Amino acid sequence: MNKLLFLIIAIVALGWSAPVSAVERDLIRVAISRAADSVNLQGDGMLALRETGMAVVLPPAATVSVGHGQIMLDGTGYRRLRITAAGPIKVNTKSYRGVLELSASNGVLLVINELPLEDYLVGVINSEISSTWPMESVKAQAVIARTYAVAKRIERHGSPYHLEATVMDQVYSGSDLEDSRAARGVHETAGQVLTYHGKPIQAFYHATCGGKTEDSSHVWGAALPYLKGVDCQYCALGNSNTWEQALSLSRLETALKVAGLTDIRLGPRNSRGRLKTVLLSTSHGTVTMPATKFRMAVGSTVIKSTNFTVRVDDGSAYFSGSGYGHGVGLCQWGAKQRALDGFSYSEILSYYYPGTELRILAPDAGF
């Protein structure tokens, strides 16, 4: 038993201090919590490794909190801990494979899940779509999630983590949503990424476009040739293709940080049919706001896209729109319908990301 414990500690210690290698390039670091004062951990055989290489054997349940600029465990302060276990570790209500790294950042806990990229992807599938969808659409999701993660790993090299586990990057719910179809979609596309001129692309995607995907230049200002808008008649069958929302002007005043809001008018639309600007009529004059900023300020789950109309009546604004998300790149519901129509995942990807090429991640690729 002591020899086994020593072996486990040695393996974990290597994970802390080993130089960058092909194996490490297969790992992804995901921030699963960035604002908590404490987290509850549960797992069998949990070990906490200090930066010195010394290990602390943890009970099956433990609480880690922040205090005096350190992370606190059983009354002792640490700068950073790496925690491993015999199986997944539950963090509050969700379980995670791999290693957890905990540190204090700006008075709160930063919890990072470090695990093999392919394991991470299995946890992404059912967080972003449903593995019950046609397998070719599941495979397409696996490839773009892998590509997105690899591109972020390059972009954020040297940062504490590569990705957030939220819509700020792509949603990742740990191991709880894993299933055999999600694993199959990842396994049958193992290592495949979308590239442009030999480099992984910025593989943006969204729920449903409302009939036309958007140019990246209209959203972020960067015109990428593989993120040009395309027509997408398939997403008309999507779950959130059209939407309506009624909001009081007082609520909008708070969200938009304006006073005396009396009317909302629409500015010009771009070539893809989405609004460029929104005009806010207030008691102090007219405020012109970029439509994307307006959407994010009110809430991206409330105003689901920048393709909408609005009327103001009796102190409320009534919105009607189509699409859900920024509209750039792959339309998830459109991809589902294309798969139902017999398109392969590679055909789906080449349609939404024109000019790209599928390539296999290689140990000497540098990414």
Task: List each model region and its residues.
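Conserved, single-site charged/polar hotspot
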Residues: 1-367
